Amino acid sequence: MTESSAQLDEAASTNKLSLHGRWLGPLFSVLLGCGLMTQTEMPVPAIATACIVVLMAGWWITEAIPLAATAMLPLALFPLTGVGEKVATAPVLNQQVTWDLDHPRFGAPLVLDIKSNGQRQGSGMMIDIHNQHGVVRSETSQTSVPLAYIRAAKPASLFEVTSRSYASKFVFLMMGGFLLGLAIERWNLHKRIALMTILTLGTQPRRLIGGFMATTAVLSMWISNTATTVVMLPIALSLIVLMREKNPQVDHIRLNNFAACLLLCIAYSASVGGLGTFLGTPTNLLFRDILDQNGIEISFGQWMAFGLPSAFIFLIIIWYLMTHVIFRISLPEFEGGRELIQSELRKLGPMSKPELTIAALFTITALLWITRSFFTKWAWLQEIYPNVIYIDDTIIAMTASLLLFVIPALGHPGKTLMDWKTANKLPWGVLLLFGGGLALASAVKTTGLGAIICEAVTPSGATAILIIMFVVTTAMIFMTEVTSNTATAALILPLLVTLAGNLDVDPKLLLIPATLAASCAFMLPVATPPNAIVFAAGQTTIRQMVRAGFVLNLVSIVLLPLLTYIIGQLVFGF
């Protein structure tokens, strides 16, 4: 896969679109800047941010340079253009300034009086609380806040301000999740889970497809959708070959339809399965971080309470449409399928001690993620261990991933569950892309660019929120057919937060369907890595993928806002 990916990257960088994008992006960016400077009274930082957004969007869409390299543009361009200066500037004496807090108990923005002696008073202070509707409520607090909890106690360089996004706690949460996934892959636990699940669900063709979808979706919730598809593809191809050998009397068109349906279902369930957890796809964590920047917290367990039933409902619909409507699978019982799966399991041998250890560690980690919002609030536990209040999902992920380097791989002398050779397979480009998206989101908010754009596009009069949700979902789905879903989400989600404020609605109503839609591009091979992987196998045509994908895109446009509105209401209480 590494060699193939390198060849694809090289081809992408030399095609005409990429070459044109390298100079068209800067050209449009400069022209936009000149136009805004002469025709509007926008603040200079907002104009600079708009130009950088256009440049990054153009380079992301055309892949003029590698996506991760484009994601690093804020590190150079934000300091050079003064973006972030407001955040970096220290408060002057006798001035009220709003600061963010690291302390979990005082997480809301805090107004501090800077006294002449340089002391920041914590008693009787005023706390500014911004709710999801943008309304400000002021409360007084008699509890002192230690100075150590206040960020940016002195002026920071603009590079330092920008680079904070690349070291966001959610970047490290993603890194911890990737390391756990790599450990599962290293010891072949994911393949064993896949084979056992398929064996359990049976080998009748429609049920077999359902088994592959269920297995792929579950794996994709915890390891990358690319790795999941790579694991499932050879198993599926072996079954397809065996089915053709065992059923020579069956019309080859029906067999070809089964093959195409099976592989497309694997690709689609890899994308949809990622909706179930925050770790399933980078866009989920990007959504969480953007809400976190706006004072709204969603726990790992809360998202699973919403994501799991949503993904399950979506998978059932995809399975039914693919097997009963689009491809109409009607084949006899798969003769020899069970024997093939059992043969593959025998090749793996009995479950090894490292597999058992990783399974136990992963289970404990997942349980801690799900229950963290509860046990950190237990009074008796706080008395025994006061620092429990500082535990968050990132600390859990990093602790578990570091333990992988410490816990010995029993039965393999001198080895631990994880080594650096395996860890170095981390998708560093994805982490940089995620950090760049966060930097962009922060700049759009702090410079006021988001407010300016959303004020211009906010519909006048009473517009049903469901209609806006459908429009947002539609735009996101078809944009991500041809662009990176993480890059697109990084551009769009910050604007939706401001738009929600202008409309006086909960921002989650717009952000959730947009986030889900970013993972639901089903039509083209370039839309997602799973689509590209199964298309490269040669068992499905572009026409089949476009036909099936277009139907599922239409279903997504209707389904995702409804899932958000119905299940989201129960979980998040809009």
Question: Model-found features: residue ranges?
Answer:
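Low-complexity, proline/glycine-enriched hydrophobic segments characteristic of transmembrane helices
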Residues: 2-12, 83-161
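Interfacial loop-to-helix junctions that mark the boundaries of transmembrane helices
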Residues: 14-20, 40-47, 59-60, 64, ...
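Juxtamembrane and boundary regions of transmembrane helices in multi-pass small-molecule transporters
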Residues: 2-38, 175, 186-192, 225, ...
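Alpha-helical transmembrane segments
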Residues: 168-179, 221-233, 304-320, 389-399, ...
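Membrane-embedded alpha-helical segments and adjacent helix-loop junctions characteristic
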Residues: 14, 69, 73-77, 81-89, ...
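C-terminal transmembrane helix pair
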Residues: 267, 431-445, 449-450, 461-574
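Flexible hinge motifs at transmembrane-helix junctions and intramembrane kinks/re-entrant loops
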Residues: 40-47, 55-73, 162, 226, ...
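Hydrophobic core segments of alpha-helical transmembrane domains in multi-pass membrane transport
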Residues: 25-38, 52-62, 74-81, 175-182, ...
